[in-house]
């Protein structure tokens, strides 16, 4: 369910009641801290870009991984020239629907230092989507992942601004 759904609101109300119950049970002067690991955006069918249906996007991509909001693309032999060509083609195709598209080599310039362990799993090309856009590939993603309305993973403020609620009993 997306974060604007009735189901989402019902879960927030349950959480609110649980925190209120916790606040009644802990000793006076206890600080309760509630946070999340990421924000969310809602998407829909009109915001899905299907790689398998777009030959220009599928060309020279041998594997797809990551989140629909932050997709990792792999090119044959991890060739840097091929990665640069794929990145440019994706920039041309997606335009403003992508927040950032770059090669693994460019990732540290945009995302900060990339450790050795992370560098080993990063795609040859990284695609961070903007607004409510997602990249899907039914050859890789399950149907439930493709139709999921509430998504995260990109580097938009809605996804990286983390809520932090505190109260002192």
Positions of predicted regions on the chain:
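Feature captures the catalytic ectodomains and active-site-proximal regions of enzymes
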Residues: 1-169
């Amino acid at each position: 369910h997306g974060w604007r759904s009735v189901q989402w609101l019902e879960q927030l109300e349950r959480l609110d009641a649980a925190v209120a119950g916790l606040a009644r049970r802990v000793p006076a002067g206890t600080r309760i801290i509630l946070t999340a690991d990421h924000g969310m955006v809602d998407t829909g069918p009109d915001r899905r870009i299907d790689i398998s249906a777009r030959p220009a996007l599928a060309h020279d991509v041998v594997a797809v991984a990551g989140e629909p909001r932050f997709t990792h693309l792999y090119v044959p032999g991890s060739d840097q020239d091929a990665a640069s060509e794929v990145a440019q083609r994706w920039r041309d195709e997606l335009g403003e629907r992508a927040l950032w598209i770059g090669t693994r080599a460019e990732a540290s310039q945009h995302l900060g230092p990339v450790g050795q362990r992370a560098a080993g799993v990063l795609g040859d090309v990284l695609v961070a989507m903007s607004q409510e856009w997602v990249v899907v590939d039914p050859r890789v993603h399950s149907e439930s992942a493709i139709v999921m309305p509430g998504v995260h993973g990109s580097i938009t403020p809605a996804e990286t601004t983390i809520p932090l609620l505190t109260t002192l009993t």
